[in-house]
Amino acid sequence: IYYHALRNYYEKDFTYIELGDGIELWENLFFNEVFEAHKNDFLLMRKFHLKNRLHMIWGNHDMTLKSEKKSTKLLDSYFDKITGTDKDLLKGLIFNEGIVLEPEGFNKNILLIHGHQADFYNYVWWKWSRFLVRVLWKPLQVVGIKDPTSPAKNFKELIKVERRLKKWILANNNQMVIAGHTHRPRFPEPNELPYFNDGSCVHPRSITGIEIVDLKISLIKWHIISKKDGTLQIVKSVLEEPRD
């Protein structure tokens, strides 16, 4: 689903901004394992990068990539097993903690972050949280025990993170924010604080995201449907349409 959606955006000349945790480096010790499992995705991202249409934000699960030395080592090139040579991948790609969009003709800037900045365990104590994920929570997930510190798996933590983000928005002149981290898609009503969340790309049957077209924001979902002839098709649905 992710590859199909990303290819669609590439063909339509979109710019892709990844809001963090795009590369799972907590549960996976070695990037090469991630690359081999998602090679087609990375090669498609390379096409975006070559056209200067790829921008990356680091989250808690790929926070090590905030180091340019680390991101260069992991992402600049890959080993092609067919030719037996190293080939360029995402050479020179920089990971940012946040990005500010300043659209022409729009009366407000838009702050893009992962969102773990409002999550003490996953921002300040991220190394400790990563250790626990690797040695404790990952094995326990096999028997159905979820990580209580993860907002994506603990509803109470999710609400706390959202509350902190909204408090920050209110304290900063209703700064518009688009975040991730919680895996819960959010799209505010006109009278609510301008907090958006793009949801998640890890669910097996659907992925969600935020689209900005002609200064208008939509919450969208790519998912699989079953057609009458028994075939499956990936389609895009608009969950929340732009509002004035």
Give the role of each language-model region.
Residues 1-244:
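Extended recognition/assembly regions associated with phosphoester-bond processing machinery
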